[in-house]
Amino acid sequence: MKFIIKLFPEITIKSQSVRLRFIKILAGNIRNVLKHYDETLAVVRHWDNIEVRAKDENQRLAIRDALTRIPGIHHILEVEDVPFTDMHDIFEKALAQYREQLEGKTFCVRVKRRGKHEFSSIEVERYVGGGLNQHIESARVKLANPDVTVHLEVEDDRLLLIKGRYEGIGGFPIGTQEDVLSLISGGFDSGVSSYMLMRRGCRVHYCFFNLGGAAHEIGVRQVAHYLWNRFGSSHRVRFVAINFEPVVGEILEKVDDGQMGVVLKRMMVRAASKVAERYGVQALVTGEALGQVSSQTLTNLRLIDNVSDTLILRPLISYDKEHIINLARQIGTEDFARTMPEYCGVISKSPTVKAIKAKIEAEEENFDFSILDKVVEEANNVDIREIAQQTQQEVVEVETVSGFGANDVILDIRSIDEQDDKPLKVEGIDVVSLPFYKLSTKFGDLDQSKTWLLWCERGVMSRLQALYLREQGFANVKVYRP
């Protein structure tokens, strides 16, 4: 099988040296992501595209899907590469490829040509289009908005029959820009802002301020691992978890109620800046949007920025909540965010929307900054690839089984879309569907006399959710890995 990778247009307008560097990085990213599917896979760089060739036909769909999620790719063409002799030979090959697809449809032919030939692209379009129209009685030519567009590419003596076109996510290849540290909470905003910086070519590390205990951290780990695995797995990144409960306790005890929200955000920026400096990261990323909550007014944001020299990027600053939720839905983080607890909003009953610098600084004089230094020093830093492995170790008390007993029921915790695409059927045992994002509210409604075997495709989510349910007091859960 063969795929032609078309570059994001902004890459093509770079200078020659920059363009070549971007293409080289993108090719490396593609190779890093796809090597898990086919070790014999070949990635070949060209000036205006990248060619991907693989032998394992069983991995066609997986490879195609992975390519659509790699930043820097505008679109992917799945092609069949064949030799040709003349224009009539091109028509015959196009007829064999597209006959069934064009039955009863309107169509047009679009040709791109490179090399020296005795014909032009328009001449090929007319010849092939006329021939298809004559030989397929139920098809009819329609140049504007046809049902099917027949894409052909002619390069020297080779014809590329385009079997399918699939849109990529665009943007710049990860690694073409410098690293950033995303302050991730697991909600709608931080997930989307992290994705936007990945799409813009940054390697995104994650910094999580834990205000809600182990269950909260498990949920945020899921979001970070999902984002990395889906859009950024070409690079290693860090997940840094900081226990911020001592800091919150100090704020609650020492800081005036109305100033708590701004002071908390200033403490978070101070801590994140220390982490960024430690690892040589150039900027912080937050999901703040102007006016969304009390701490996100221009006055308050300016005061928050003042505590650090580190650049703070806010890609969602002008976005409304509906737009952010729609983006979260598109990238697949909506379900995580809907069930993620929100802790920052409950710290102050009457938050100020226009904090005064002198008053904030006066309140912070009462704060014991050694507490902040200590929680940063004790931060838990892991390679995000180890999250699944760590989860395996953490849930050692949750039994993993490959078989089942008479009282067992398999609980398919994949998302609804995944279940619809690939339903789970296991002979000899009932399978119940309950998406992972409903477990926290719906698991208790299930028959608790049964033993529930949690299952997902890769086993990461099922282990994380098993740990979460155990912490909630449910002992009747196991992880199912056949």
UniProtKB/Swiss-Prot annotation:
Query: Which Gene3D superfamilies does the record match to this protein?
Result: 3.30.2130.30, HUPs (3.40.50.620), Rhodanese-like domain (3.40.250.10)
Q: What is its EC number?
A: 2.8.1.4
Pathway, per UniProt? Cofactor biosynthesis; thiamine diphosphate biosynthesis
Q: Which reaction does this chain catalyze?
A: [ThiI sulfur-carrier protein]-S-sulfanyl-L-cysteine + a uridine in tRNA + 2 reduced [2Fe-2S]-[ferredoxin] + ATP + H(+) = [ThiI sulfur-carrier protein]-L-cysteine + a 4-thiouridine in tRNA + 2 oxidized [2Fe-2S]-[ferredoxin] + AMP + diphosphate; [ThiS sulfur-carrier protein]-C-terminal Gly-Gly-AMP + S-sulfanyl-L-cysteinyl-[cysteine desulfurase] + AH2 = [ThiS sulfur-carrier protein]-C-terminal-Gly-aminoethanethioate + L-cysteinyl-[cysteine desulfurase] + A + AMP + 2 H(+)
The places in or outside the cell where this protein is found are: Cytoplasm
Q: For the Rhodanese domain, which residue ranges apply?
A: 404-482
Q: Which GO terms describe its biological process?
A: thiamine biosynthetic process; thiamine diphosphate biosynthetic process; thiazole biosynthetic process; tRNA 4-thiouridine biosynthesis
Pfam families according to UniProt? ThiI, ThiI_fer, THUMP
List positions binding ATP: L183, I184, K265, G287, Q296
Keyword RNA-binding among record annotations: yes
Protein name as it appears in the record? tRNA sulfurtransferase
**In this UniProt entry, which cysteines form S-S bonds?**
C344-C456
Q: Does the keyword Nuclease apply?
A: no
